[in-house]
Amino acid sequence: MKNKYHIFFTGMLSIAFFMGATVDTKAQDSIAVVSRVNIEHLKAMPDLQLSNTLQGQAAGLIVIPNTGGIGYANSTFYVRGQHSNGTNKAIVIIDGIERPIDDILPEEIESIEVLKDASAKILYGAQATNGVILVRTKRGQAGKRVIRFGAEYGVQPVTRLPEYLDSYNYATLFNEACVNDGLLPLYSDADLQGYRNSTGVNDLLHPNVDYYKEFLRSSSTFRKATLELSGGNARAKYAVTVGYTGSSGLEKVGDRSDLNRVNARGNLDIRITDFLSASADVAARVEKKDWGAKDGGGMFSEISTLRPNEYP
C-alpha cells in the first residue's frame, strides 16, 4: 500500500486604487473571442476531476482526460485543436495566477471563460498563445448573506470492459495457429472438450477464468460534501468555501485505490476609504491518495495479458 500526501497552499494580498468609477465591458462589446461555461452544469456532473467535466462545455475547447485513475494529473486542454509541432496546450489562470484547475471545486467558481484569440496573448503573454481558460472564484456581496450546504454519494458504473475469448475458443484458435506454423496442436481433443464443459474458475484441470470479472468491480463510488458562506456590508465582504471529496476505485482483489481530499478557500475584500481597497485570497488543499494494489492502469495492463486457462 502506498500513501501519497499533498499539501497545497497559496495566498495573495493585493491593494488597488479606484478613482470613483469602474467600467464593465459587456460580452457583446468585447473584441475577444470568448466562450463561457455554465457552472451549474459542472456541479451536476458525477466526476471529482473538475478538468474532466469541461468536455463539451465550451465551443472550441478540447479536453483530453488523463487515464491514470482517480487523483491523477489534470486533463489536457486544447483550444481549436493542435496546430503546431510545439506545445499546443491552453493555460489555466485562476484569480490571476496560473494553477491547475483540479486544485479547486466547482462550488468555489463564479465564472469560467475560454479566451481563444490574440487578445489572450496580449493579456497574458507568449504562454497564452494557445488560449487561456480564465477562472474567477466567488466573492462576497454586500447585504447578501449566503449559507449553503450540499452532500452527494453515488456510484459510477463502468462504461465497458474489454471482452476476451473463453478458454475453449482460445485453445481452439491457438491450435489453429500452431498448425499454420507447421507445429503440432498444443491442446488435445480431450482438453478442448474439457474447456467446453469447464465449470469456470474452480475447475482445476480445465479452468475458464474471466479475469476482469474476478479482479474488478462493475462500478466505483464517489462522495462529496461542501459548505459555502458569504456575505458582507459596504466596508467588508467575504466568501468562504470548504469541501470534502472522495472516491474509491474498481479493485475487487487486494488493496482498493482511494482518494480523500479537503479544499478550503477564503476571499476577503475590504474598502478602506473611497479611494483605497484591499483584497486577500487564501486557498489550501490537503489530499491523501492510496494507489491500491497497482499504480494507475497497471492492473488493467496485467489482466489483459492473462490467458483464460492460465490459472484455476
Model-derived regions, located:
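Short linear motifs in intrinsically disordered
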Residues: 78-85, 303-304, 309-311
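Outer-membrane beta-barrel and related beta-rich outer-membrane complex signature
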Residues: 158-167, 252-254, 279-281, 286-310
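Short, small/polar-rich motifs associated with maturation and membrane association
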Residues: 1-265, 272, 277-279
